[in-house]
C-alpha cells in the first residue's frame, strides 16, 4: 500500500530517436514500465486547482480522514480537529451538520444537499465548498463566483471517484 504522501503510477512509454544522417545501426530505444511518482500536491495543483471554463477553485486540499494534511493550496484554511470530527460525523450519520453548519478554518457554511456517506456540500455567500470522501482521504474544494457550485462539484467529485477507483 502506498504511503499517504506519495502515489506511484506506472506509465508505459515509447521513445524513438530519429536522425536524417546515415546511421550504421538503429537507434530506436524502447522504455518499458517507467515508474513515475505522483505526489499528492500534484493532485491538488493539477487536478483541483485546474481551469474550468475560465474559472478556478479558490482553495483546495486533500486530507487524511484523521485530518492530516496530505496536500493543499496556499490559501486553504487551517482546519481545526473539531471541524474534521464534525465532517466525519456527518459522513457517518448524514444530517448532523445541518443544524449547526459546516465549519472550515472558522468559516461557517450552510450545509446543502449532498450525497449521504459520499459528498458534503456547503454554501457561504456567493461561494461554497464540496467535500468528497474517498477510501482513505477527504477531498476539499472551496469556490467563489464566478465559479459555479456545479463546476466545483465536478472537479472535486471526479478526483474523488478516481482516487476511490485507485483504492485510495
Swiss-Prot record:
Biological process annotations from GO: defense response
GO molecular function, one term: actin monomer binding
Induction statement: Induced by hydrogen sulfide. Down-regulated by treatment with the flagellin peptide flg22 elicitor.
Subcellular location(s) per record: Cytoplasm, Cytoskeleton
Disordered: annotated segments: 14-36
UniProt miscellaneous comment: Plants overexpressing PRF3 exhibit a dwarf phenotype with delayed seed germination, reduced lengths of roots and hypocotyls, and inhibition of hypocotyl cell elongation due to F-actin rearrangement.
Record's function text: Binds to actin monomers and regulates the organization of the actin cytoskeleton. Can increase the critical concentration (Cc) of actin assembly in vitro. Acts as a downstream effector of the hydrogen sulfide signaling to regulate the assembly and depolymerization of F-actin. At high concentrations, profilin prevents the polymerization of actin, whereas it enhances it at low concentrations. Binding to the poly-proline motif of formin induces oligomerization of PRF3.
Name of protein: Profilin-3
Phylogenetic classification of the source organism: Eukaryota, Viridiplantae, Streptophyta, Embryophyta, Tracheophyta
Amino acid at each position: 500500500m502506498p504511503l499517504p504522501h506519495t502515489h506511484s503510477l506506472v506509465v508505459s512509454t515509447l521513445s524513438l530517436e530519429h536522425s536524417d544522417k546515415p546511421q550504421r545501426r538503429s537507434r530506436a530505444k524502447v522504455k518499458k514500465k517507467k515508474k513515475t511518482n505522483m505526489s499528492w500536491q500534484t493532485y491538488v495543483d493539477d487536478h483541483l486547482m485546474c481551469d474550468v471554463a475560465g474559472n478556478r477553485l479558490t482553495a483546495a486540499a486533500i486530507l487524511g480522514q484523521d485530518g492530516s494534511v496530505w496536500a493543499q493550496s496556499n490559501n486553504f484554511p487551517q482546519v481545526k480537529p473539531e471541524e474534521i470530527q464534525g465532517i466525519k460525523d456527518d459522513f457517518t450519520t448524514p444530517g448532523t451538520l445541518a443544524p449547526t453548519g459546516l465549519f472550515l478554518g472558522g468559516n461557517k457554511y450552510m450545509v446543502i444537499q449532498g450525497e449521504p456517506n459520499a459528498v458534503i456540500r456547503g454554501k457561504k455567500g456567493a461561494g461554497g465548498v464540496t467535500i468528497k470522501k474517498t477510501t482513505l482521504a477527504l477531498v476539499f474544494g472551496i469556490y467563489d463566483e464566478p465559479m459555479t457550485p456545479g463546476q466545483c462539484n465536478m472537479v472535486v467529485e471526479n478526483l474523488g471517484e478516481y482516487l476511490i477507483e485507485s483504492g485510495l
